[in-house]
Amino acid sequence: MNWDQIKGNWKQFKGQAQQKWGDLTGDDLDRVDGKREELVGVVQERYGIAKDEAEKEVKDFESNCRC
């Protein structure tokens, strides 16, 4: 799945993001609003990980998203 599809249907994918990253709040996910870089930043911030690790996690999420 490509990010444009996720971005266009963010409300649908928010639940999957919440399952993958249980520490993210509803406010975090609303702030992301389908923006990939914002999601990377929020994951990095909440989990205290390096940007490249957060990027890898988001890429994994992108690859495994289900419509």
Where are each of the predicted segments found?
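Intrinsically disordered, low-complexity, hydrophilic segments
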Residues: M1-C67
